[in-house]
C-alpha cells in the first residue's frame, strides 16, 4: 500500500522536496529483506532500534506496506521475555544479548504509526508486543532510576548509558500514550518513567561518562527529559565542540568526522525546544551526504574530504525523513519528538534520596 498524495509527504523548502523525501524512503524499502527486516544496508546486519527508525521513516513517506512488514518483523521475532537480539544478519542471530534501548524503541515506532495512520487494528495487534517489551525494559531499572543498558543470559550489565536511557524515557512515554489509547492503564510504567526522567535530569553521576560523543550532548533534550532553560543551556554549552558550520555535527568531539544521523537528531532536539533557525540550518548542512538515488552516506571525514565509513546507511536516510517531518509539520506524527500529548508519568510523585535529604 502506497499513500499516493505527495502533499502528505514532508518537504523542506530550499533543501528537500517531497519527491526527494519519497525517493529516500524508497531507498530504505529497497534494502528490506523478505522477512521484513530493514538492515543497515543491503546485506548488512539488522538491529531492533534502527529497524524501527527505518519503519517510522517509511510511515512518514507513505510507504505503508513495507512499514507494516517491518512492524510484523518486530512481532514475529520478539522473544518470549519481550526482548530482541542486539544483532541479526539475514535471519541469523549474531549477538543474542538484549539492549534495553533497542527493545524499548518499538513503542515509539508503534505509537508514531498509529498517530499517522489512525489504524486501531494495527494498535491492537502491536499492543501486546509493546507491553512485553516495556515490561522487559522496566525490569532492568536500577535503584537510582536509571536503566541498565543490556542483559545477557548471565544477568544484567549494571551500567547505564545516558543516551540509551534518554531514548528509553521517550519510548516509555510513547508506550503510555498507546496504553491510554488502548484503555490499559500502566501505573508501574508511570512510576518507572518518572524515576528515569529524574535520574537523567538530576543525576549525571548515575551514567557511564561518554562525553566525547555528540549523542550524550543532545539526547537528554531529544528524549524530552530536559526542556526549557535547562535544555537550551545544555545545547548551548557544547555547541562549538560539535557543530561544524556548513557540514553538520561531529560524531565525537575530537575527530574531524561529521555524521548525518546525529545531525538530524540534533535537528529534532532543536525543534523540540523551539530553536527553529538553528534546526533548519543544521538540516540543510547535512545534505552534502545525499546521493542521486536518495540514499545518504553515514558521514564525512572533512579534513580529507572522504566518506567514512564507506556505506550508505538506511537509518541515516530515516533520521533525515523524521527531521524533515518535524520541521515541515507535515504528518500527524510530526510532533512525536516534541513530546506532543505524551504522558510524563509520575514526575515528582516519589521519593528520591536527593530530595528527602533536603527536607
Curated annotation (Swiss-Prot):
Q: Which domain of life is it from?
A: Bacteria
- EC number(s) of the enzyme? 3.2.1.221
What InterPro entries does this protein map onto? 6-hairpin_glycosidase_sf, 6hp_glycosidase-like_sf
Question: Mind listing the GO biological process terms from this record?
Answer: carbohydrate metabolic process
Enzyme kind, highest EC tier: hydrolase
What is the annotated temperature dependence of this protein's activity? Optimum temperature is 45 degrees Celsius.
The UniProt catalytic activity note for this protein reads: Endohydrolysis of 3-O-methyl-alpha-D-mannosyl-(1->4)-3-O-methyl-D-mannose linkages within (1,4)-3-O-methyl-alpha-D-mannnan substrates
Keywords attached to this Swiss-Prot or TrEMBL record, sorted alphabetically, are: Carbohydrate metabolism, Hydrolase
Q: Which GO terms describe its molecular function?
A: hydrolase activity
Q: State the pH dependence.
A: Optimum pH is 6.5.
As for what it does, the entry says: Hydrolase involved in the biosynthesis of 3-O-methylmannose polysaccharides (MMP), which are intracellular polymethylated polysaccharides implicated in the modulation of fatty acid metabolism in non-tuberculous mycobacteria. Highly specific hydrolase that catalyzes the internal cleavage of MMP. Is able to hydrolyze purified MMP into distinct lower order oligomannosides but does not cleave acylated or deacylated forms of 6-O-methylglucose lipopolysaccharide (MGLP), beta-mannans, synthetic 4alpha-oligomannosides or its own reaction products.
Quaternary assembly: Monomer in solution.
Which named protein is this?
MMP endo-(1,4)-3-O-methyl-alpha-D-mannosidase
Q: Which organism is it from?
A: Mycolicibacterium hassiacum (strain DSM 44199 / CIP 105218 / JCM 12690 / 3849)
Amino acid at each position: 500500500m502506497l499513500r499516493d498524495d505527495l502533499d502528505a509527504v514532508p518537504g523542506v523548502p530550499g533543501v528537500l522536496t517531497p519527491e526527494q523525501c519519497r525517493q529516500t524512503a524508497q531507498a530504505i524499502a529497497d534494502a528490506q529483506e523478505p522477512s521484513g527486516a530493514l538492515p543497515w544496508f543491503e546485506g548488512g546486519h539488522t538491529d531492533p532500534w534502527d529497524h524501527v527508525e527505518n519503519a517510522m521513516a517509511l510511515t512518514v513517506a507513505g510507504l505503508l506496506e513495507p512499514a507494516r512488514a517491518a512492524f510484523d518483523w518486530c512481532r514475529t521475532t520478539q522473544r518470549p521475555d519481550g526482548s530482541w537480539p542486539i544483532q541479526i544478519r539475514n535471519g541469523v542471530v549474531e549477538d543474542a544479548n538484549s539492549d534495553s534501548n533497542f527493545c524499548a524503541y518499538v513503542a515509539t515506532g508503534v505509537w508514531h504509526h498509529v498517530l499517522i495512520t489512525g489504524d486501531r487494528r494495527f494498535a491492537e495487534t502491536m499492543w501486546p508486543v509493546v507491553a512485553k517489551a516495556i515490561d522487559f525494559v522496566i525490569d532492568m531499572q536500577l535503584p537510582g532510576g536509571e536503566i541498565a543498558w543490556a542483559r545477557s543470559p548471565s544477568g544484567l550489565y549494571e551500567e547505564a548509558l545516558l543516551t540509551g536511557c534518554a531514548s528509553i524515557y521517550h519510548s516509555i512515554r510513547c508506550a503510555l500514550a498507546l496504553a491510554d489509547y488502548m484503555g490499559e492503564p500502566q501505573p508501574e510504567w508511570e512510576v518507572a518513567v518518572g524515576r528515569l526522567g529524574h535520574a537523567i535530569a538530576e543525576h549525571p553521576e548515575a551514567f557511564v561518562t561518554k562525553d566525547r560523543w555528540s549523542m550524550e550532548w543532545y539526547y537528554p533534550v531529544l528524549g524530552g527529559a530536559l526542556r526549557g532553560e535547562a535544555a537550551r543551556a545544555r545545547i548551548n554549552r557544547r555547541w562549538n565542540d560539535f557543530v561544524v558550520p556548513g557540514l553538520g555535527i561531529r560524531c565525537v568531539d575530537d575527530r574531524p568526522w561529521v555524521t548525518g544521523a546525529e545531525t538530524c537528531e540534533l535537528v529534532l532536539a532543536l525543534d523540540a525546544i523551539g530553536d527553529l533557525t538553528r534546526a533548519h540550518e543544521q538540516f540543510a548542512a547535512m545534505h552534502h551526504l545525499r546521493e542521486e538515488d536518495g540514499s545518504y552516506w553515514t558521514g564525512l571525514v572533512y579534513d580529507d574530504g572522504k566518506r567514512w565509513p564507506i556505506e550508505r546507511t538506511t537509518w541515516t536516510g530515516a533520521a533525515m525523513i523524521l527531521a524533515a517531518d518535524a520541521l515541515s509539520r507535515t504528518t500527524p506524527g510530526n510532533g512525536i519528538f516534541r513530546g506532543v500529548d505524551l504522558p510524563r508519568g509520575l514526575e515528582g510523585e516519589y521519593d528520591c534520596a536527593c530530595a528527602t535529604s533536603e527536607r
